[in-house]
Amino acid sequence: MQCLLVDDDPDDQEVFLMTLEKINKNIECLTANNGVEALSLLTSQETFIPDYIFLDVNMPKMNGIECLKNIKGLAHLNHCKIFMYSTTSEASVLEKSKKLGATDFIVKPASPAVLEETLSGILNN
């Protein structure tokens, strides 16, 4: 199983990666700090085709919404499940994510236990 985590916050990346590895020791997860880096990884590495992409909404250079639009234009990623996440739960952001083809939206939880429960549900579904 492969995934791509796109987040500009190194602390959030670390917690997310540790949680993913706790749930599935065999997961291969690459990281990108923004949408530009994510698209570069997804278009330049034909051997890396993630099953899951986790996109933070608010990032510099290219935010998660713009990145999602671009990813949806890449035919080789049609099977990929894309989860947007953010500390915001604004209806407009949730709606836009769904409209653009995100699989679901995760509101960043306050605790690692909630994150583990959420990610476990995603990966084991």
Predicted regions and their residues:
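Active-site residues of response regulator receiver
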Residues: 55-56
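Short amphipathic alpha-helix used as the core "switch/output" element in two-component signaling
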Residues: 40, 65-78
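Helix N-cap/capping motif at the beta->alpha junctions
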Residues: 31-43, 64
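Alpha4 helix (beta4-alpha4-beta5 surface) of REC/receiver domains from two-component response regulators
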Residues: 14, 66, 89-104, 114-117
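Receiver (REC) domain active-site loop signature in two-component systems and cognate sites
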Residues: 59-62
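A Lys-centered signature of the CheY-like receiver
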Residues: 108
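Two-component/phosphorelay signaling modules centered on CheY-like receiver
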Residues: 10-30
